[in-house]
A protein has these predicted regions:
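Solvent-exposed beta-strand/loop surfaces of large extracellular or lumenal domains
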Residues: 160-184
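Aromatic-lined ligand-binding clefts that engage carbohydrates, nucleic acids, or primary amines
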Residues: 104, 122, 130, 135-162, ...
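Surface-exposed coil/turn segments at beta-strand junctions on protein surfaces, enriched
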Residues: 121, 141, 178-180, 191-194
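Bacterial N-terminal signal peptides that target proteins for export
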Residues: 2-13
Length: 227
């Protein structure tokens, strides 16, 4: 009798442990939280770099690489309605910090303005590392708020160190702002010499539902410093 009761207790404990284990696995597999969005200052910057010039990009050690983006058919997600057998994804997914872009062509900063893609439903990746120097000419950037400001024709999403800064329910400058609108993303509220940022800009031709006969290109790319 005691053996039977013991077996029942063990079985019940095992059943309780299963959802706990599943819950633990789910938590372990959850993606890390995105960094919160920070609104850029609205005052004039103490110093400004034009990253579409050789001099401006060189000041931050930028090396711009570019890649076309393909739309590929993939199986539908788990739990999709039965009529949906396939869906679409993009290749490559190049937002992560450790993405290998070594085979992508390097472009000159001025060629960020080149009109790329074949138009219509079209996307482009632009990637570059940025490193804060001890001095930019006579300007000392230490302690400054550093803001990356880009305007992509027509839309963009901006990845910083492997993430799109943002939080559900809050505005984020790293996400689509509007048609040909500047996106001013705070990289740090207090930079120091040697700080590194891996930037990945996902350029989008739009309006997407119109699929216009336009291309993807940078209208501007700047680094702003505020003190």
């Amino acid at each position: 009798m005691q053996t039977t009761n013991l077996a029942k207790i063990v079985a019940a404990a095992a059943l309780v442990a299963v959802p706990l284990a599943i819950s633990s696995i789910s938590v372990a597999q959850a993606p890390p939280p995105r960094p919160p969005p920070i609104m850029a200052p609205s005052i004039p910057p103490a110093h400004l770099l034009d990253l579409m010039t050789a001099q401006g990009s060189a000041a931050l050690g930028a090396q711009w690489r570019v890649s076309d983006v393909k739309i590929v058919e993939v199986p539908a997600i788990q739990g999709a309605m039965p009529q949906y057998k396939t869906t679409y994804n993009i290749e490559p997914k190049a937002g992560s910090t450790d993405f290998d872009d070594s085979k992508w062509p390097v472009i000159e900063p001025k060629d960020l303005a080149a009109r790329r893609s074949g138009g219509h439903v079209a996307f482009m990746w632009y990637r570059s590392p940025l490193t804060i120097p001890a001095k930019i000419g006579e300007f000392d950037p230490s302690g400054a708020v550093a803001v990356l400001s880009v305007t992509v024709d027509d839309y963009a999403e901006v990845w910083v160190n492997g993430a799109i800064p943002g939080r559900s329910g809050y505005p984020s400058p790293a996400t689509i702002q509007g048609h040909n609108m500047p996106q001013r993303v705070v990289l740090s509220t207090s930079v120091k010499a040697g700080d590194k940022f891996q930037i990945a800009v996902f350029g989008i031709n739009g309006p997407i539902s119109m699929a216009p006969a336009n291309t993807v290109w940078f209208r501007e790319a700047k680094m702003e410093f505020y003190k």
